[in-house]
Regions:
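Short Pro-Cys-Gly-centered "Cys-loop" motif that presents a nucleophilic cysteine in a tight turn
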Residues: 1-61, 68-238
Length: 238
């Protein structure tokens, strides 16, 4: 089966998950050091490849990003650069387990849930006791657990609109972060990423049809319905 082209639409954020072929901690001594280095590469590559970063989490088995690319190739180039740098540092072959998966995220509806999904990944999937304090994630900047700001973090308008001051925004986000996502939200995000279809309402998906790089939602399975002959004749007579 031919693989799907990347789904892209101008100005629309993308949720990205790139899985490593092998956990980094088993490929190099000092798992934290390689994550420090990977995070630096990520930060350095954003401006070079024209990517606005809204949220991120790095783990020993993958990269999770919420970002708005400047063009159709920006995110692909960024991920490829990270893969090349890792392969060189680890003196290995390919580092990713296949292609990264991505989905377009509807602003105003799914951006905050997507942020919570990726920033709570280490708690949900790794059993980390406090994912807010994960050093290789934007979670602490959004909840206020980290002091100061991150120069490369470009907060999405949905985050900015949640409060008038940084404290208000952090408090509002921390509340939703602590509350977590429903099982339905988790399932919708997982399905959109797995299928690489858009994550959003029917109205959002309808709008994407005229601007996206390819069809944003899965078509109906099976052959198109063939109308009975008597209906076809009726149509011609009308």
């Amino acid at each position: 089966m031919a693989r799907l082209p990347r789904l892209y639409a101008p100005g629309i954020p993308q949720l990205v998950h790139a899985r490593f072929l092998f956990p980094l901690a088993t490929r190099a001594s000092g798992g934290s050091r390689i994550l420090d280095t990977l995070q630096k590469w990520l930060f350095d590559g954003l401006a070079r490849h024209g990517v606005m970063l809204h949220a991120w989490t790095l783990t020993d088995d993958g990269i999770l990003l919420l970002a708005t690319p400047g063009d159709e190739k920006s995110l692909s180039r960024l991920i490829q650069m990270l893969g090349r740098n890792l392969a060189t540092t680890l003196r290995s072959g390919p580092v990713f387990s296949g292609r990264y998966r991505s989905t377009l995220v509807e602003p105003g509806v799914w951006v905050i849930p997507a942020m919570i999904w990726l920033e709570s990944w280490v708690a949900r999937e790794k059993g980390a006791s406090d994912s807010e304090l994960w050093p290789w994630s934007s979670a602490g900047f959004h909840t206020g657990a980290f002091m100061g700001s991150c120069p490369v973090l470009n907060d999405h308008a949905d985050y900015w609109s949640s409060g008038n001051t940084p404290f208000d925004r952090q408090a509002a986000y921390k509340y939703r972060y602590t509350e977590g996502l429903s099982s339905g939200q988790l399932q919708q995000i997982a399905q959109a990423l797995h299928g690489q279809w858009a994550l959003g309402s029917p109205g959002f998906i309808s709008q994407l049809c005229s601007v996206a790089s390819r069809r944003p939602m899965q078509g109906r399975r099976g052959r198109p319905r063939i109308r009975p002959i008597h209906e076809q004749g009726q149509s011609l007579e009308e």
